Protein backbone atom coordinates (compact mmCIF):
# COMPACT_ATOMS: atom_id res chain seq x y z
CA UNK A 1 0.00 0.00 0.00
CA UNK A 2 0.46 2.57 -0.67
CA UNK A 3 -1.31 -0.47 -0.08
CA UNK A 4 0.69 -3.16 -1.76
CA UNK A 5 3.69 -0.89 -1.88
CA UNK A 6 4.85 0.66 1.37
CA UNK A 7 3.19 -1.79 3.76
CA UNK A 8 4.18 -4.86 1.75
CA UNK A 9 7.72 -3.49 1.55
CA UNK A 10 7.66 -2.92 5.30
CA UNK A 11 6.63 -6.51 5.97
CA UNK A 12 9.15 -8.02 3.58
CA UNK A 13 11.97 -5.86 4.91
CA UNK A 14 11.08 -6.83 8.45
CA UNK A 15 11.17 -10.53 7.55
CA UNK A 16 14.51 -10.24 5.76
CA UNK A 17 16.05 -8.10 8.47
CA UNK A 18 15.11 -10.50 11.22
CA UNK A 19 16.30 -13.47 9.22
CA UNK A 20 19.67 -11.76 8.96
CA UNK A 21 19.58 -10.94 12.65
CA UNK A 22 18.90 -14.51 13.68
CA UNK A 23 22.45 -14.88 14.95
CA UNK A 24 22.13 -12.01 17.42
CA UNK A 25 23.47 -12.62 20.91
CA UNK A 26 21.54 -15.23 22.84
CA UNK A 27 19.42 -14.59 25.89
CA UNK A 28 18.39 -16.87 28.72
CA UNK A 29 14.70 -17.35 28.14
CA UNK A 30 13.72 -19.82 30.83
CA UNK A 31 12.20 -17.09 33.02
CA UNK A 32 9.94 -16.11 30.13
CA UNK A 33 8.29 -19.53 29.99
CA UNK A 34 8.82 -20.60 33.60
CA UNK A 35 5.66 -21.91 35.30
CA UNK A 36 6.95 -22.98 38.71
CA UNK A 37 5.15 -22.11 41.96
CA UNK A 38 7.67 -19.34 42.64
CA UNK A 39 7.31 -17.84 39.17
CA UNK A 40 5.66 -14.60 40.29
CA UNK A 41 8.26 -13.99 42.99
CA UNK A 42 11.11 -14.64 40.56
CA UNK A 43 9.60 -12.18 38.10
CA UNK A 44 9.15 -9.58 40.84
CA UNK A 45 12.69 -9.98 42.19
CA UNK A 46 14.21 -9.88 38.72
CA UNK A 47 12.20 -6.82 37.72
CA UNK A 48 13.34 -5.05 40.87
CA UNK A 49 16.97 -5.66 39.88
CA UNK A 50 16.40 -4.57 36.27
CA UNK A 51 14.63 -1.42 37.39
CA UNK A 52 13.14 -0.40 34.07
CA UNK A 53 10.98 -1.51 31.16
CA UNK A 54 10.34 0.01 27.73
CA UNK A 55 7.18 -0.55 25.71
CA UNK A 56 6.53 0.29 22.07
CA UNK A 57 2.80 0.57 21.54
CA UNK A 58 0.00 1.97 19.43
CA UNK A 59 -1.94 3.23 22.46
CA UNK A 60 -2.85 6.92 22.32
CA UNK A 61 -0.67 8.67 24.90
CA UNK A 62 -3.17 10.92 26.67
CA UNK A 63 -6.04 8.45 26.42
CA UNK A 64 -4.54 5.15 27.58
CA UNK A 65 -0.74 5.01 27.49
CA UNK A 66 0.01 7.61 30.15
CA UNK A 67 -2.73 6.29 32.49
CA UNK A 68 -1.35 2.76 32.03
CA UNK A 69 2.16 3.96 32.84
CA UNK A 70 0.99 5.79 35.94
CA UNK A 71 -1.02 2.81 37.16
CA UNK A 72 1.86 0.38 36.63
CA UNK A 73 4.42 2.56 38.37
CA UNK A 74 2.03 3.23 41.24
CA UNK A 75 1.91 -0.52 41.87
CA UNK A 76 5.58 -1.16 41.09
CA UNK A 77 7.46 2.08 41.90
CA UNK A 78 10.81 0.27 41.66
CA UNK A 79 10.39 -0.24 37.90
CA UNK A 80 10.54 2.83 35.67
CA UNK A 81 8.23 2.40 32.68
CA UNK A 82 9.12 4.28 29.50
CA UNK A 83 7.25 4.24 26.22
CA UNK A 84 7.38 5.07 22.55
CA UNK A 85 4.15 5.42 20.62
CA UNK A 86 3.75 4.58 16.94
CA UNK A 87 1.64 2.76 14.38
CA UNK A 88 2.20 -0.99 13.99
CA UNK A 89 4.44 -0.69 10.92
CA UNK A 90 6.57 1.94 12.66
CA UNK A 91 6.92 -0.28 15.73
CA UNK A 92 8.05 -3.18 13.55
CA UNK A 93 10.53 -1.00 11.70
CA UNK A 94 11.97 0.38 14.93
CA UNK A 95 12.48 -3.07 16.42
CA UNK A 96 13.95 -4.22 13.10
CA UNK A 97 16.58 -1.50 13.22
CA UNK A 98 17.41 -2.28 16.84
CA UNK A 99 17.90 -6.00 16.19
CA UNK A 100 20.04 -5.30 13.15
CA UNK A 101 22.18 -3.03 15.32
CA UNK A 102 22.24 -5.66 18.10
CA UNK A 103 20.88 -2.97 20.42
CA UNK A 104 17.30 -3.86 21.38
CA UNK A 105 15.76 -1.10 23.50
CA UNK A 106 12.11 -2.14 23.41
CA UNK A 107 11.23 -4.82 25.96
CA UNK A 108 7.56 -5.12 25.04
CA UNK A 109 5.61 -4.41 21.85
CA UNK A 110 1.84 -3.93 21.83
CA UNK A 111 -0.81 -2.87 19.39
CA UNK A 112 -3.33 -3.73 16.71
CA UNK A 113 -1.51 -5.21 13.73
CA UNK A 114 1.78 -5.62 15.57
CA UNK A 115 1.11 -9.31 16.17
CA UNK A 116 0.75 -9.99 12.46
CA UNK A 117 4.10 -8.44 11.66
CA UNK A 118 5.75 -10.06 14.67
CA UNK A 119 4.59 -13.56 13.79
CA UNK A 120 5.35 -13.21 10.10
CA UNK A 121 8.85 -11.90 10.79
CA UNK A 122 9.70 -14.23 13.69
CA UNK A 123 10.81 -11.30 15.85
CA UNK A 124 9.39 -12.32 19.22
CA UNK A 125 9.94 -15.08 21.75
CA UNK A 126 7.53 -17.30 23.69
CA UNK A 127 6.46 -16.22 27.16
CA UNK A 128 4.08 -17.35 29.85
CA UNK A 129 1.77 -15.19 31.94
CA UNK A 130 -0.73 -16.74 34.34
CA UNK A 131 -3.08 -13.90 33.41
CA UNK A 132 -3.55 -15.41 29.94
CA UNK A 133 -5.51 -18.27 31.45
CA UNK A 134 -8.49 -15.97 32.09
CA UNK A 135 -8.64 -14.71 28.49
CA UNK A 136 -10.89 -16.09 25.73
CA UNK A 137 -9.26 -19.19 24.24
CA UNK A 138 -10.11 -18.11 20.70
CA UNK A 139 -7.91 -15.03 21.14
CA UNK A 140 -4.93 -16.76 22.73
CA UNK A 141 -1.92 -17.73 20.61
CA UNK A 142 -1.18 -21.39 21.46
CA UNK A 143 2.50 -20.84 20.66
CA UNK A 144 2.77 -18.28 23.45
CA UNK A 145 4.35 -15.68 21.19
CA UNK A 146 1.56 -13.14 21.67
CA UNK A 147 -1.27 -12.48 24.10
CA UNK A 148 -4.37 -10.31 23.59
CA UNK A 149 -4.56 -7.05 25.52
CA UNK A 150 -7.73 -5.61 24.06
CA UNK A 151 -10.31 -6.30 21.40
CA UNK A 152 -10.79 -4.04 18.41
CA UNK A 153 -14.13 -3.73 16.66
CA UNK A 154 -14.39 -1.83 13.39
CA UNK A 155 -17.36 0.18 12.20
CA UNK A 156 -18.65 2.77 9.79
CA UNK A 157 -18.06 6.35 10.94
CA UNK A 158 -20.41 9.04 9.69
CA UNK A 159 -20.84 12.78 10.05
CA UNK A 160 -24.21 13.35 11.73
CA UNK A 161 -24.63 16.75 10.07
CA UNK A 162 -24.02 15.42 6.57
CA UNK A 163 -25.75 12.05 6.87
CA UNK A 164 -29.43 12.17 7.95
CA UNK A 165 -30.39 9.57 10.54
CA UNK A 166 -32.72 7.81 8.11
CA UNK A 167 -29.97 7.61 5.46
CA UNK A 168 -27.21 6.05 7.57
CA UNK A 169 -26.08 2.85 5.80
CA UNK A 170 -27.31 -0.20 7.68
CA UNK A 171 -25.49 -2.84 5.64
CA UNK A 172 -22.42 -3.14 3.44
CA UNK A 173 -24.75 -3.23 0.44
CA UNK A 174 -26.15 0.17 1.42
CA UNK A 175 -22.74 1.65 0.65
CA UNK A 176 -23.50 0.95 -3.02
CA UNK A 177 -26.27 3.56 -3.08
CA UNK A 178 -25.44 6.18 -5.75
CA UNK A 179 -25.83 8.93 -3.13
CA UNK A 180 -22.53 7.82 -1.56
CA UNK A 181 -20.44 7.92 -4.73
CA UNK A 182 -17.20 9.76 -3.94
CA UNK A 183 -18.21 10.22 -0.30
CA UNK A 184 -16.81 7.05 1.28
CA UNK A 185 -13.26 6.98 2.63
CA UNK A 186 -10.98 4.28 3.98
CA UNK A 187 -7.41 3.93 5.24
CA UNK A 188 -5.03 2.38 2.72
CA UNK A 189 -1.79 2.35 4.71
CA UNK A 190 -2.92 0.39 7.76
CA UNK A 191 -3.53 -3.33 8.12
CA UNK A 192 -6.75 -2.57 10.00
CA UNK A 193 -8.06 -0.34 7.23
CA UNK A 194 -8.63 -1.41 3.64
CA UNK A 195 -7.01 -4.89 3.86
CA UNK A 196 -9.07 -5.85 6.90
CA UNK A 197 -12.24 -4.56 5.24
CA UNK A 198 -11.58 -6.75 2.19
CA UNK A 199 -10.44 -9.78 4.18
CA UNK A 200 -13.47 -9.61 6.46
CA UNK A 201 -15.94 -9.89 3.60
CA UNK A 202 -13.91 -12.52 1.76
CA UNK A 203 -14.03 -14.69 4.86
CA UNK A 204 -17.67 -13.98 5.67
CA UNK A 205 -19.15 -14.13 2.17
CA UNK A 206 -16.78 -16.30 0.19
CA UNK A 207 -14.60 -15.17 -2.71
CA UNK A 208 -17.28 -15.06 -5.42
CA UNK A 209 -19.83 -12.96 -3.57
CA UNK A 210 -17.13 -10.72 -2.09
CA UNK A 211 -15.51 -10.04 -5.47
CA UNK A 212 -18.87 -9.20 -7.02
CA UNK A 213 -19.43 -6.70 -4.21
CA UNK A 214 -15.93 -5.22 -4.47
CA UNK A 215 -16.37 -4.57 -8.19
CA UNK A 216 -19.57 -2.67 -7.46
CA UNK A 217 -17.95 -0.79 -4.58
CA UNK A 218 -15.09 0.26 -6.86
CA UNK A 219 -17.68 2.11 -8.92
CA UNK A 220 -18.38 4.26 -5.85
CA UNK A 221 -14.97 5.92 -6.21
CA UNK A 222 -13.92 5.27 -2.61
CA UNK A 223 -11.48 7.91 -1.37
CA UNK A 224 -8.08 6.43 -0.49
CA UNK A 225 -6.98 8.11 2.73
CA UNK A 226 -3.32 7.37 3.25
CA UNK A 227 -1.85 10.06 5.46
CA UNK A 228 -2.85 9.21 8.98
CA UNK A 229 -4.30 6.87 11.55
CA UNK A 230 -7.88 5.79 12.16
CA UNK A 231 -8.14 8.60 14.70
CA UNK A 232 -7.04 11.10 12.07
CA UNK A 233 -9.60 9.80 9.59
CA UNK A 234 -12.38 10.08 12.18
CA UNK A 235 -11.28 13.67 12.78
CA UNK A 236 -11.66 14.32 9.04
CA UNK A 237 -15.17 12.87 9.14
CA UNK A 238 -15.98 15.12 12.10
CA UNK A 239 -14.71 18.11 10.12
CA UNK A 240 -16.99 17.22 7.21
CA UNK A 241 -14.23 16.38 4.76
CA UNK A 242 -15.69 12.89 4.32
CA UNK A 243 -19.31 12.01 5.15
CA UNK A 244 -18.45 8.32 5.64
CA UNK A 245 -15.41 6.26 6.60
CA UNK A 246 -15.38 2.47 6.66
CA UNK A 247 -13.41 0.21 8.98
CA UNK A 248 -12.40 2.66 11.68
CA UNK A 249 -12.12 1.66 15.32
CA UNK A 250 -15.72 1.65 16.52
CA UNK A 251 -14.98 3.44 19.79
CA UNK A 252 -13.38 6.55 18.30
CA UNK A 253 -16.57 8.14 16.89
CA UNK A 254 -18.75 7.44 19.94
CA UNK A 255 -16.15 8.85 22.33
CA UNK A 256 -16.02 12.02 20.22
CA UNK A 257 -19.82 12.09 19.99
CA UNK A 258 -20.03 12.00 23.79
CA UNK A 259 -17.95 15.18 23.76
CA UNK A 260 -20.34 16.88 21.37
CA UNK A 261 -18.69 16.17 18.01
CA UNK A 262 -20.93 15.61 14.93
CA UNK A 263 -19.93 11.99 14.41
CA UNK A 264 -21.15 8.52 15.26
CA UNK A 265 -20.50 4.83 14.57
CA UNK A 266 -22.60 2.19 12.88
CA UNK A 267 -21.80 -1.50 13.22
CA UNK A 268 -22.21 -3.43 9.97
CA UNK A 269 -22.87 -7.17 9.85
CA UNK A 270 -20.41 -8.85 10.12
CA UNK A 271 -18.30 -6.64 12.35
CA UNK A 272 -14.60 -7.21 11.64
CA UNK A 273 -12.66 -7.73 14.84
CA UNK A 274 -9.03 -8.25 15.74
CA UNK A 275 -7.09 -8.44 18.95
CA UNK A 276 -4.41 -5.99 19.91
CA UNK A 277 -1.56 -8.15 21.12
CA UNK A 278 1.46 -7.92 23.36
CA UNK A 279 4.81 -9.65 22.87
CA UNK A 280 8.42 -9.70 24.01
CA UNK A 281 11.02 -9.08 21.27
CA UNK A 282 13.96 -11.39 20.92
CA UNK A 283 16.98 -10.20 22.91
CA UNK A 284 14.91 -7.92 25.17
CA UNK A 285 17.14 -6.43 27.86
CA UNK A 286 14.70 -6.55 30.74
CA UNK A 287 12.82 -9.88 30.52
CA UNK A 288 11.63 -9.89 34.14
CA UNK A 289 10.29 -6.36 33.93
CA UNK A 290 8.71 -7.19 30.58
CA UNK A 291 6.83 -10.08 32.17
CA UNK A 292 5.79 -7.92 35.11
CA UNK A 293 4.36 -5.31 32.76
CA UNK A 294 2.55 -7.93 30.69
CA UNK A 295 1.12 -9.51 33.84
CA UNK A 296 -0.16 -6.10 34.91
CA UNK A 297 -1.66 -5.13 31.55
CA UNK A 298 -3.50 -8.46 31.31
CA UNK A 299 -4.69 -8.36 34.93
CA UNK A 300 -8.07 -6.90 35.94
CA UNK A 301 -6.23 -3.77 37.13
CA UNK A 302 -4.53 -3.17 33.80
CA UNK A 303 -7.61 -4.16 31.84
CA UNK A 304 -9.54 -1.62 33.89
CA UNK A 305 -7.25 1.10 32.52
CA UNK A 306 -8.23 0.07 29.00
CA UNK A 307 -11.90 0.18 29.97
CA UNK A 308 -11.65 3.67 31.45
CA UNK A 309 -9.93 4.80 28.25
CA UNK A 310 -12.92 3.70 26.19
CA UNK A 311 -11.24 0.58 24.80
CA UNK A 312 -12.55 -2.98 24.83
CA UNK A 313 -10.64 -5.13 27.35
CA UNK A 314 -9.69 -8.66 26.34
CA UNK A 315 -10.49 -9.92 29.85
CA UNK A 316 -14.12 -11.15 29.87
CA UNK A 317 -14.51 -10.09 33.49
CA UNK A 318 -13.80 -6.42 32.78
CA UNK A 319 -16.64 -4.58 31.08
CA UNK A 320 -16.10 -1.75 28.63
CA UNK A 321 -17.14 1.72 29.71
CA UNK A 322 -20.73 2.87 29.25
CA UNK A 323 -19.53 5.40 26.66
CA UNK A 324 -18.63 2.66 24.17
CA UNK A 325 -21.24 0.07 25.14
CA UNK A 326 -23.40 1.08 22.17
CA UNK A 327 -20.72 -0.15 19.75
CA UNK A 328 -19.90 -3.34 21.59
CA UNK A 329 -21.34 -5.92 19.17
CA UNK A 330 -21.65 -8.47 21.95
CA UNK A 331 -24.11 -6.09 23.63
CA UNK A 332 -25.71 -4.81 20.41
CA UNK A 333 -26.12 -8.40 19.22
CA UNK A 334 -24.43 -7.80 15.87
CA UNK A 335 -22.48 -10.80 14.46
CA UNK A 336 -18.72 -10.52 14.86
CA UNK A 337 -16.03 -11.95 12.60
CA UNK A 338 -12.93 -12.24 14.81
CA UNK A 339 -9.87 -12.65 12.60
CA UNK A 340 -6.66 -13.97 14.23
CA UNK A 341 -3.27 -12.64 13.17
CA UNK A 342 -2.28 -15.80 11.29
CA UNK A 343 -5.47 -15.64 9.21
CA UNK A 344 -4.89 -11.96 8.44
CA UNK A 345 -1.37 -12.81 7.28
CA UNK A 346 -2.71 -15.60 5.07
CA UNK A 347 -5.39 -13.48 3.40
CA UNK A 348 -3.67 -10.10 3.17
CA UNK A 349 -1.59 -10.73 0.02
CA UNK A 350 -4.73 -11.43 -2.01
CA UNK A 351 -6.55 -8.51 -0.38
CA UNK A 352 -3.63 -6.31 -1.47
CA UNK A 353 -4.04 -7.59 -5.02
CA UNK A 354 -7.77 -6.86 -4.98
CA UNK A 355 -7.12 -3.31 -3.83
CA UNK A 356 -4.58 -2.74 -6.58
CA UNK A 357 -6.83 -4.27 -9.22
CA UNK A 358 -10.00 -2.37 -8.32
CA UNK A 359 -9.39 0.62 -6.09
CA UNK A 360 -5.92 2.06 -6.59
Where are these regions (language model features)?
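A bilobed periplasmic-binding-protein/Venus flytrap-type ligand-binding module shared by bacterial periplasmic
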Residues: 155-162, 199-203, 274-287, 305-306
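Extracytoplasmic ligand-binding site segments that recognize negatively charged/polar headgroups
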Residues: 54-70, 81-99, 103-241
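Extracellular/periplasmic bilobal clamshell ligand-binding domains
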Residues: 320-360
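Periplasmic-binding protein-like
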Residues: 137, 151-154, 180-190, 214-220, 225-227, 297-320, ...
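A ligand-binding cleft/hinge motif common to bilobed small-molecule-binding domains
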Residues: 115-119, 243-262
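Short amphipathic alpha-helical coupling segments at ligand-binding clamshell hinges
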Residues: 68, 209, 213, 285-297, ...
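Extracytoplasmic "Venus flytrap"
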Residues: 29-40, 48-67, 189-192, 276
Amino acid sequence: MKFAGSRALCLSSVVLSFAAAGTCHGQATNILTYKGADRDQRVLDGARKEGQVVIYTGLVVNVALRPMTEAFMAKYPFVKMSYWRGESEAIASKITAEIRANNVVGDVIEGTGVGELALAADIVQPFYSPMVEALPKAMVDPSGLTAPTRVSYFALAYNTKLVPADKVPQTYEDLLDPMWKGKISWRIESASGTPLFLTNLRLAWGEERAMDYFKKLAGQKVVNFGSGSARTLVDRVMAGEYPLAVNVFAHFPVISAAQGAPVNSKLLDPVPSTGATISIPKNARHPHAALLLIDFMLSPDGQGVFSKAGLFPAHPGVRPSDVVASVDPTIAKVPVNFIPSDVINKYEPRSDEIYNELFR
